[in-house]
């Protein structure tokens, strides 16, 4: 475990990044760069050490390599997602798009393909932390921020969801995606719009739009009664996705 120490800055106020990679050179480069721009950094060289450090340090974001000894990144991601919605960005040298999508399906929020620019990774970290830490979404429909469906309660102010009175855990990115769809319920968002609004990707980045499809699939699996025949998050053919129109009967008045 490696930590940066800076006497002039209270470490408790700094956002903490856990870097997990079996390549010492990558760990060192990222630790140095992220420390210089104000993050508190901890590092792990394999999956088992990563899980131990995760529970000890409670990081604000995890940078996670896929190919590692003892326990690979997929396994680490699965274990973290059992009890945490911390943002996870996966590092992958795997060229197959299917491999990257696997990470997203297991709960990762984003991915960066090796070799990558450290500046790009820094931008991705800022983006996921900004979305995680941003002020609660304010619905134009209700001051309570609570929307009720037959089996689902969405509390936008507390960023909590209950399905049949049972709390459903969403990652920060999943909730941001849901917020976006709800913000214009009944109106479709294109995949490109979603990539730009939620992930901060501009059209010239040429990002695989299946990133959106994977996250929509995960949301449906968690929220819908029948994910294969969704009632809430609908597909707009040839366009993208929309949340079903929210009416006054769905809104809890204050």
From Swiss-Prot:
NCBIfam families: ResRegRpaBCyano (NF045944). This is Probable transcriptional regulator ycf27. GO terms for molecular function: phosphorelay response regulator activity; transcription cis-regulatory region binding. It is found in: Plastid, Chloroplast. Probable promoter-specific protein mediating the interaction between DNA and RNA polymerase. GO terms for biological process: regulation of DNA-templated transcription. One of its GO terms (cellular component) is chloroplast. It comes from Guillardia theta. Its main location: plastid. Residues 85-103, 144-245 bind DNA. Residues 16-129 form the Response regulatory domain. CDD domains: REC_OmpR, trans_reg_C. InterPro entries: CheY-like_superfamily, OmpR/PhoB-type_DNA-bd, Sig_transdc_resp-reg_receiver, WalR-like, WH-like_DNA-bd_sf. The modification 4-aspartylphosphate is found at residue 65. Keywords: Chloroplast, DNA-binding, Phosphoprotein, Plastid, Transcription, Transcription regulation, Two-component regulatory system.
